């Protein structure tokens, strides 16, 4: 990992926009493959798999397959509370070509997992996620194989996952939005509104709520960048630039 801090420069604000756009584009030395198709989901412990929508949530998939009623109609909110106490699994398969396998490195990128998720690639555990607000980037070059690759995600019930913390705490935190008598919402890095609010129902869900990609590249890649405005006038903006680069070549 190399940190490169660019020299302070004076540039027009328009150039900053161009740099941001270029950062998201591919070139001859890299390839980005979106893995949002071909997903299936299942209630853990069963062998019944159904097509899933990614990005999405398990409630969304259950509604589509008519396994739960519309939770926003009447008192149907009460009929869907069982979902939050179950574990759920998602899986898909994707193909790796000889050209992709020859790349110097590959990264599996999850922009958002909600919330307690074990990620497996070809049977190997790669990640145990516990925060829906952050993305995860996983090096997967050594796990990839030519042809079909299997990606499997096991989502743990956010209720059962945090209940031990609640039970050992000895008291209820004042989370008035939480529509349950046991306020386990305070123990999760998860959107509080899913546990209920004065304007919304309780629907504690799980799922792949943001896109999934696999990124192939040669030599190096920009993993992060930060632009800080130092000063601003009507004529010029003075900026400092910092790049974080993954460099896999020998130093």
Tell me the role of every PLM-derived stretch:
Residues 1-12:
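Bacterial N-terminal signal peptides that target proteins for export
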Residues 12-20:
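Bacterial N-terminal signal peptides
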Residues 26-27, 31, 42, 85-221, ...:
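Accessory beta-strand-rich segments of carbohydrate-active enzymes
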Residues 30-44, 49-56:
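Mature N-terminal segment immediately following signal peptide/propeptide cleavage
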Residues 46-51, 55-70, 184, 200-204, ...:
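N-terminal, polar/Ser/Thr-rich
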Residues 70-81:
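Surface-exposed, low-complexity/disordered Ser/Thr/Gly/Pro/Asn-rich loops and linkers
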Residues 119-121, 236-251:
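Beta-strand-rich binding/interaction modules
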Residues 229-237:
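Short, solvent-exposed loop/linker segments at the N-terminal edge
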């Amino acid at each position: 990992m190399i940190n490169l801090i660019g020299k302070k420069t004076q540039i027009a604000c328009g150039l900053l926009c161009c740099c941001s756009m270029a950062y998201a584009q591919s070139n001859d030395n890299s390839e980005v493959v979106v893995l949002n198709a071909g997903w299936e989901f299942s209630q853990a412990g069963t062998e019944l798999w159904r097509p899933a929508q990614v990005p999405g949530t398990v409630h969304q998939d259950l509604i589509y397959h008519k396994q739960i009623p519309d939770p926003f109609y009447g008192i149907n909110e009460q009929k869907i509370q069982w979902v939050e106490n179950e574990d759920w699994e998602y899986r898909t398969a994707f193909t790796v070509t000889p050209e992709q396998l020859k790349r110097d490195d590959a990264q599996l990128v999850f922009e958002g997992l909600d919330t307690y998720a074990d990620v497996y690639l070809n049977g190997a555990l790669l990640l145990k996620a516990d925060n829906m607000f952050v993305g995860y980037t996983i090096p997967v070059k050594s796990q990839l194989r030519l042809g079909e690759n299997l990606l499997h995600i096991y989502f743990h019930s956010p209720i059962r996952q945090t209940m031990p913390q609640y039970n050992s705490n000895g008291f209820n935190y004042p989370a008035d939005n939480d529509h349950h008598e046991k306020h386990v919402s305070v123990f999760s890095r998860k959107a509080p509104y899913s546990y209920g609010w004065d304007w919304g129902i309780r629907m504690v869900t799980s799922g792949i709520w943001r896109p999934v990609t696999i990124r192939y590249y040669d030599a190096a890649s920009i993993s992060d960048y930060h632009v800080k405005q130092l000063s601003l006038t009507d004529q010029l903006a003075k900026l400092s630039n910092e790049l974080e680069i993954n460099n896999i070549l020998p130093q």
